[in-house]
């Protein structure tokens, strides 16, 4: 298992394969650094932007290798917070590479920010690369984890306020479109 965080232009990450954070068998990239600090966060150690190890070209190559087998459905970004502005800037070149080299793989991301916050020009989470980063995703699970709304029956979410967004359909229609689990079984 690896770990990494974004430090300046570096990112520290942890990676592993799992089936709990998106459809199918996935490679999970844990991005360090988070200012949301949700109560009872399941990964509070990843709030630190320096947690884990630096994201290097060797790490990137290893993730591409891990993503390559046919039985791997795709990549999931977790945190920490992938949509911290400095994390967005560091993730963008890697996600471009995943799309270029492995176009058949899906990319999911979890964020404590809402879709609306990511599109609000005055919001902390929005930066010059947010739109392109979102355009590279298939699914975004948005919203802060709210302990009072925790529900173990929810698939791919920790609390009922979080939404599973079909990013391509949302961008194409201009209307927030939830991911249809039944259509993706």
Sequence positions of predicted segments:
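Short glycine-rich, flexible loops that bind phosphorylated cofactors or substrates
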Residues: 84, 148-149
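Conserved Radical SAM active-site core
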Residues: 25, 40-123, 128, 132-133
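N-terminal pre-triad scaffold of radical SAM enzymes
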Residues: 14-37
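Single conserved hydrophobic/aromatic residue that forms the stacking wall/gate
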Residues: 1-13
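Short, conserved loop/helix-junction motifs that constitute active-site signature segments
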Residues: 132-135, 158
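Receiver (REC) domain switch/active-site residues of two-component response regulators
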Residues: 138
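P-loop/Walker A phosphate-binding loop and immediately adjacent motor/lid segment at beta-alpha junctions
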Residues: 94-99, 150-185
